[in-house]
Design a protein with these regions (language model features):
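Short histidine/acidic/glycine/proline-rich micro-motifs that form metal-
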Residues: 98, 254-256
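Generic structural signal for alpha-helix termini and adjacent loop/cap motifs
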Residues: 41, 251-254
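A short, terminal or domain-edge coil/loop segment
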Residues: 134-135, 259-263
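Residue-level detector of intrinsically disordered/flexible regions characterized by low predicted structural confidence
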Residues: 8-9, 256-259
């Protein structure tokens, strides 16, 4: 689903509420399943700034914690190669492998690579990466998590042509729900099958949502037809109001003349 509307219509605010980053002014939100929310300017918690980029991606499925535990056991085993330490490390590694942990790590790296993040950059701590790289790392984490529903606000920002092509293919094949805000017309035409138009004339007014089925191009055609119909209706109403006002003015003038004649 593509979310469209003029600037200030409330698209980003709607996403914040749906994603749990903000509370609605009134009413309540009922969410089914889990949501993966990518804001325009994602904020990564300060406690994670020293972690590597790949660890942050893996945190989408909590795999980073398991890898950290295995790494600690490995260091412990190398420092003291007792039978107990070797057994602990082997057990943790076997459990991780049985749960598909290593395959999942390979999947996470493939997603990151698809978004244009090179392996050497993934090994660096988050705080040394550029803003564009950090946003791609966060997008990779959200895609890797495999949430029931994705909320993506301008997901193609900071992506080159190859990364955009990869993302489009990923979203086409995504099995969960997808809501997206984007100015990328190719994304809107290729990845969505419905459009929700946020119709909010003024920033302090209550808006409404109009649904259109089809791609963004089909929405544009249908929306133009709706606006033409509404403009024609408004013109007819204005014409009728003017006609009625003329009638009122005419009879008002006659009534005034009659009253003056009667007083004389």
């Amino acid at each position: 689903i593509g979310i469209v509307g003029r600037n200030g219509a409330g698209k980003t605010s709607l996403f914040k509420v749906l994603g749990g980053a903000a509370e609605p002014t009134f009413g309540s939100i009922v969410r089914k399943g889990d949501f993966g929310y990518l804001p325009q300017d994602p904020k990564i918690p300060g406690s994670r700034e020293t972690l590597s980029a790949i660890s942050h991606v893996l945190s989408g499925r909590q795999i980073d914690e398991q890898l950290t535990r295995i790494e600690k056991l490995r260091i412990q085993m190398e420092e003291s190669s007792t039978a107990a330490n070797i057994a602990k490390f082997s057990k943790a590694e076997d459990e991780f492998a049985m749960k598909g942990g290593y395959a999942a790590e390979s999947e996470a790296r493939a997603i990151a690579a698809g978004l244009g993040l090179k392996a050497d950059r993934l090994a660096l701590p988050l705080h040394v990466l550029s803003g564009g790289e950090r946003r791609r790392v966060e997008l990779a984490r959200i895609l890797f998590a495999g949430s029931d529903t994705l909320l993506l606000d301008e997901p193609t920002n900071h992506l080159d042509v190859d990364a955009k092509t990869w993302l489009l293919e990923f979203l086409r094949n995504y099995r969960g729900g997808l809501l997206v805000i984007s100015h990328d017309l190719e994304l809107l035409d290729e990845a969505i099958t419905r459009v929700l138009h946020l119709d909010r004339p003024m920033e302090d007014s209550v808006g409404r949502i109009v649904e259109y089925r089809g791609t963004y191009s089909q929405y544009k055609t249908a929306r133009a037809a709706d606006e033409a119909r509404l403009a024609k209706k408004a013109a007819l109403q204005s014409k009728e109001i003017a006609r009625l006002q003329t009638v009122v003015d005419r009879f008002g003038a006659k009534a005034t003349k009659a009253a003056m004649a009667h007083s004389v």
